[in-house]
């Protein structure tokens, strides 16, 4: 299985394996998806226990990295379905850059594109990616 790569930025300048980018704190593209229901509750997920990066952390509905050639919306839709098992229309709201080093030697340094969508049903989570979920 080929190792997942991330897109280095600000203009795309190349690809790098995801783990290496997090080890070297190289700026790369990412996205965060927030799903709301009709009660204006947000769907949160708890990352699966076997994830190398922040296992069991409660986080937004889903977040990941764009693949080469994917738009932000395509990437968000792909990963939302892979992790949470549903599709819904997404809208990109804004983007920002952040850097956050962690105790495990990895650093998030991302140009993060934030998207929102709406869904009122229960997701069908992928246990390889998601431990649990809840509306909050």
Predicted feature residues:
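Active-site segment of metal-dependent pyrophosphate-handling enzymes
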Residues: 83-123
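A short, polar/proline- and glycine-enriched secondary-structure boundary/capping micro-motif
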Residues: 24-26, 53-58, 134-136
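The catalytic Nudix box helix
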Residues: 44, 59-93
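A glycine-rich, hydrophobic loop/mini-helix early in the fold
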Residues: 32-62
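Acidic, metal-coordinating catalytic segment for phosphate/diphosphate chemistry
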Residues: 1-32, 36-39
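NUDIX/MutT-family hydrolases
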Residues: 114, 126-136
């Amino acid at each position: 299985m080929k190792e997942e790569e991330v897109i280095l930025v600000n203009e795309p300048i190349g690809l790098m394996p995801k783990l290496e980018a997090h080890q070297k704190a190289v700026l790369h593209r990412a996205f965060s998806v927030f799903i709301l229901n009709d009660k204006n509750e947000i769907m949160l997920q708890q990352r699966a226990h076997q994830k190398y990066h922040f296992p069991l952390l409660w986080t937004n509905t889903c977040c990941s990295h764009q693949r080469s050639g994917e738009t932000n919306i395509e990437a968000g839709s792909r990963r939302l379905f892979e992790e949470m098992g549903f599709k819904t229309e997404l809208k990109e709201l804004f983007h920002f850059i952040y850097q956050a080093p962690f105790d495990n030697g990895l650093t998030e340094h991302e140009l993060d594109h934030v998207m929102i969508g709406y869904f009122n049903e229960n997701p069908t989570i992928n246990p390889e990616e998601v431990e649990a979920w809840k509306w909050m």
